[in-house]
Amino acid sequence: MSSRKSRSRQTGASMITDEQINDLVLQLHRLLPELANNRRSGKVSASRVLQETCSYIRNLSKEVDDLSERLSQLLESTDSAQAALIRSLLMQ
């Protein structure tokens, strides 16, 4: 008698419905550049959205690491007054 929409999953003390999961997957789909650019290709499976989300997060993390390394190298190559100024700007 329970429909797909009314089913829920219990995670700890909270309940989440299939409809809420579908809404979250749709929100992720809209955020992913790879999938957002291909909207006319039709419906994308939740599995694909989650795989693309994981891949996108890994890529963003790698970019952050690379930029952090570049910034560290830049700060090492500048004099201490300039480095202090850059650090103070970054902390704001």
UniProtKB/Swiss-Prot annotation:
Induction: Not induced by exogenous gibberellin. Residues 5-60 form the bHLH domain. Gene3D superfamilies: Helix-loop-helix DNA-binding domain. GO terms for biological process: gibberellic acid mediated signaling pathway; photomorphogenesis; regulation of growth; regulation of timing of transition from vegetative to reproductive phase. Expressed in roots, leaves, stems and flowers. GO terms for molecular function: DNA-binding transcription factor activity; protein dimerization activity. GO terms for cellular component: nucleus. Keywords: Gibberellin signaling pathway, Growth regulation, Nucleus, Transcription, Transcription regulation. Disruption phenotype: Pale-green sepals and carpels and decreased chlorophyll levels. It is found in: Nucleus. Signal peptide: none annotated. InterPro entries: bHLH_dom, HLH_DNA-bd_sf, PRE. The keyword Transcription applies. Belongs to the bHLH protein family. Plants over-expressing PRE4 show long hypocotyls, pale green and slightly narrow leaves, elongated petioles and early flowering. They are not sensitive to the gibberellin inhibitor paclobutrazol during seed germination. Interacts with HFR1 and IBH1. PANTHER family: TRANSCRIPTION FACTOR PRE (PTHR46446), TRANSCRIPTION FACTOR PRE4 (PTHR46446:SF17). Atypical and probable non DNA-binding bHLH transcription factor that integrates multiple signaling pathways to regulate cell elongation and plant development. Regulates light responses by binding and inhibiting the activity of the bHLH transcription factor HFR1, a critical regulator of light signaling and shade avoidance. May have a regulatory role in various aspects of gibberellin-dependent growth and development. This is Transcription factor PRE4. It comes from Arabidopsis thaliana (Mouse-ear cress). The gene is PRE4.
